[in-house]
């Protein structure tokens, strides 16, 4: 006996969802604190940022070396032959020590600028840690929200599946029209599609979390923490004030401004003289002619000074450029403060909006559950229509999803407010972050692209073929429906005219 279209579609979509929702065994339990700690200890992007500290420290050593002793050696050899004279051959070797006595303040300014650079690099790394912490929190809550969304969508699928069975039974008994069966089948199909999309979103969010934690990209995870409402009692003005005074990127911009001030001093040093001290021994020896074979040893010390009194305006141009860079840094600092003010306010307003939604959406869920129950019972009693049942179920799903959204919006925006304020890491998080420096830097392997010889199964894309088979089954169902379209149209017309069986 040929099964009804709705029943066949239900079985097909159920098989699809069963394949997609299968979860691997032995998933690792991960709390939010664990996720943050692992990310701080292993995130590659954070490691890249931390390398800037080593660069800044090397630049500081270089600047200090420019203002200290240096030594150089020299050697020469020459031969000379003039007409009617014997050939003359001689050589010399020398060692010279140099020390900059006065550079017009250039070397000292470069040292101070490099010291600011070390501070900037440290603040940049610290800010990157705080941002990474927020990114992990967001990814964690995104995954949790997706997981609860799956639960709601699965409940909808279960309801529409049961509803389809009920409608088919009523249709077989002659108390409902066939158009109700078709409508119930379509709603079940739509619910299945929504479920599949939410399951995919969950996997994408887990992949994002694994990437931030820098763990095995295929490792199954079980997120053990969940939303718990916790009040945020700090007023907006205090949040903005804290951000202005404590944001690491704003502090880094302040140091950058100081660097540009030192750059002006470096440029202005071009108008001043330089004084250098040099001293060292030298040895010279004459080899030919043999009658003049002699050696000379000297020790010299002296002070030299130089002063560029005219350079066609080159120094003036360098000073003007340095001052323009300083003014730009001042504007960048002002803009960073304004951006921080806006970002804190935006996150704060969004957090409060989500907080207000928590209570209202909770009430809406209870009301929607009652409405859905009434609609189902009225339909079973023959006093309601299918549209009322569908609308009530949709309203219930929407209310539940809105409540879930409000919960995790509040959690995410609260974390964003804390991040935008520039609140530092906890002691435990700093301990985890300290492990980052000890990781070795591995050389990325070079891969050669070759055509596969054996065509082994791809674990990452193995479901693609399965989905293709499922799509083929759906296409077959649609084709079958198209073949029976004239019969279905006739049946629907009869039912609308009151002649349905």
Positions of predicted regions on the chain:
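Transmembrane beta-barrel architecture of outer-membrane proteins
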Residues: 90-92, 138, 183, 274, ...
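Acidic, low-complexity, intrinsically disordered peripheral segments
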Residues: 2-4, 26, 402-501
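Membrane-embedded beta-strand positions in outer-membrane beta-barrel channels/transporters
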Residues: 94-96, 140, 276, 302-304, ...
